[in-house]
Amino acid sequence: MKNVTITLLFIIQTFSVRSQTVPGSIMPLNSNEFRNRIAIRELIDSFAYYADRTKAQRQAALFVENGTLEIYQSEPDTSKPIIVLKGRKELEEAFKGLEKYNMTFHLNGQNSIKFGDDTTGTVQCLAHHIFFENGKRMLQTEAIRYYDTYTRQNNRWLFVKRKLIIDWEDKRLSTP
């Protein structure tokens, strides 16, 4: 019983919003910021989930009406995007392109969110795509970083802009 009590106290202390801090930050989170961070993380994870379930319309609806997705093969500060999509209709059509894969799996990793005049974030993702090429099952893996700008509309967080940077990619034969 003593171990259960100690464990519960540890969990309560760890997740107490009054004392919670952001890694690399000395500023404690207040409960409103804590809720907003969770809501933004749900937005980020919903984007990956809808990509994997090929729900292009729902994925596009995670953006503001005139939201933008820019795709880069190197740092945005030193290069131009290879693709720019603007507005939910363009985004939805582009997201339908994931239907060409037999399966996808996007695994979101670290993320950092900064609140201010603009709410921004950085997200890391490993994207896995299974497809067939010349009768052979292939796996394409991409290490992706997103530089995001978020806004809150009608009590819901949405993407204003996502800059998708492909850090590296690997394509190989896949054996189930």
Kindly give the residue locations of the regions a language model identified.
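Bacterial Sec-dependent N-terminal signal peptides
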Residues: 1-23
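Alpha-helical elements of Rossmann-like donor-binding domains used by nucleotide-donor carbohydrate transfer enzymes
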Residues: 46, 90-93, 145
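Short, low-complexity N-terminal intrinsically disordered segments enriched in polar/charged residues
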Residues: 20-53, 57, 61-65
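Alpha-helix initiation/capping motif
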Residues: 33-36, 80, 84, 139
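A beta-strand edge to alpha-helix "cap/lid" segment located at domain peripheries
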Residues: 20-32, 97-176
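A solvent-exposed, acidic/Ser-Thr-rich amphipathic alpha-helical stretch
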Residues: 56-126
